[in-house]
Amino acid sequence: MSSPGTESAGKSLQYRVDHLLSAVENELQAGSEKGDPTERELRVGLEESELWLRFKELTNEMIVTKNGRRMFPVLKVNVSGLDPNAMYSFLLDFVAADNHRWKYVNGEWVPGGKPEPQAPSCVYIHPDSPNFGAHWMKAPVSFSKVKLTNKLNGGGQIMLNSLHKYEPRIHIVRVGGPQRMITSHCFPETQFIAVTAYQNEEITALKIKYNPFAKAFLDAKERSDHKEMMEEPGDSQQPGYSQWGWLLPGTSTLCPPANPHPQFGGALSLPSTHSCDRYPTLRSHRSSPYPSPYAHRNNSPTYSDNSPACLSMLQSHDNWSSLGMPAHPSMLPVSHNASPPTSSSQYPSLWSVSNGAVTPGSQAAAVSNGLGAQFFRGSPAHYTPLTHPVSAPSSSGSPLYEGAAAATDIVDSQYDAAAQGRLIASWTPVSPPSM
């Protein structure tokens, strides 16, 4: 005699089994109304045929990649007339639609030669296979997971030759007994040309319009383009000191002045690794609007951010436009001992200053540096050549005099003695600072 607890447990288990059996029965009945045990009324129709026709009018294209690419539009068919209780498998393959190799010329596809040998026949088996006829008939059969590739790598992918036209075929095979082919169906509107990249822009636009996954890529591209557009104005805006980076390459104009008169050099030479070169990246990533006439060297003199001094140097450059000078204008290095200066400079000197006295350099140095009489006639003022030593200029002296008084053997009637007197009067001795 069974206890009440055992009877209740058996009833609850039966209820659970009945629920499962009922679910299976409902699943089988879902497509049975379209079934035909004789399979005489079997029909296979293409889903979204209007969309396929729009692509066919433009000559549809499908991407093939090494790793495989899914199709769009997705191949879907609706089936009716199968035996609801029989088992079937659905297969898909692709056949050549013609005997041509195609090429895209002047906005249209034209035959481009003989086709390549056909790849080994690849067949895609629908992942729901095998299954009851009722299962296949209850909803459209979608081949959304099939991938097209141009490499023979297996993995259930379909290998196609690029620039060849193909047509998909769907096969229905009855299984679970004597296996036999029931039917094969193909749809001309699903023909396409396999490509590694879309050729027709209209095909690209149509796929983006109707493919929900392509819209995600399009939105990402639009965001990327918008970000680039937002960054471009910031890149094109250059700081106010950028023009000095073009005029004075290899030096930074943001450094504090080491000497109130940088055109005469400094008492202490700074190494090339000085902190003045702390903004090199600003110049390296900025394109110069004009080719720079200066040759960059490591041992370059230090320049201050003294705007009047920079402007005076730029004004003197205006008169050098007609000269093809390979080197820099002369500068005046200062030496506080009898020995010659040891610090190298990218500016060759026409004047040698020793113990506060300025003596004219050799004319050969001027000629070797490309500074002839035409250079001195183009200077802002004209002065007679100096044949005797003069004192170094004071702090109030103009930096323009350094180049104008460098000619030693030039004789010209336009030079007068009054100008020489004014020049000597404005130059005062300079005593070097104690070391």
Curated annotation (Swiss-Prot):
One of its GO terms (biological process) is heart morphogenesis. Its main location: nucleus. SMART domains: TBOX. Gene3D superfamilies: Transcription factor, T-box (2.60.40.820). Detected in testis, but not in other, normal tissues. Detected in lung tumors (at protein level). The keyword DNA-binding applies. Keywords: Activator, Developmental protein, Disease variant, DNA-binding, Nucleus, Transcription, Transcription regulation. InterPro entries: p53-like_TF_DNA-bd_sf, T-box_DNA-bd, T-box_sf, TF_Brachyury, TF_T-box, TF_T-box_CS. It is found in: Nucleus. GO terms for molecular function: DNA-binding transcription factor activity; DNA-binding transcription factor activity, RNA polymerase II-specific; RNA polymerase II cis-regulatory region sequence-specific DNA binding; RNA polymerase II-specific DNA-binding transcription factor binding; sequence-specific double-stranded DNA binding; transcription corepressor activity. Residues 279-308 are annotated as: Disordered. GO terms for cellular component: chromatin; nucleoplasm; nucleus. Involved in the transcriptional regulation of genes required for mesoderm formation and differentiation. Binds to a palindromic T site 5'-TTCACACCTAGGTGTGAA-3' DNA sequence and activates gene transcription when bound to such a site. Monomer. It is linked to Neural tube defects: Congenital malformations of the central nervous system and adjacent structures related to defective neural tube closure during the first trimester of pregnancy. Failure of neural tube closure can occur at any level of the embryonic axis. Common NTD forms include anencephaly, myelomeningocele and spina bifida, which result from the failure of fusion in the cranial and spinal region of the neural tube. NTDs have a multifactorial etiology encompassing both genetic and environmental components. Chordoma: Rare, clinically malignant tumors derived from notochordal remnants. They occur along the length of the spinal axis, predominantly in the sphenooccipital, vertebral and sacrococcygeal regions. They are characterized by slow growth, local destruction of bone, extension into adjacent soft tissues and rarely, distant metastatic spread. This is T-box transcription factor T. The gene is TBXT.
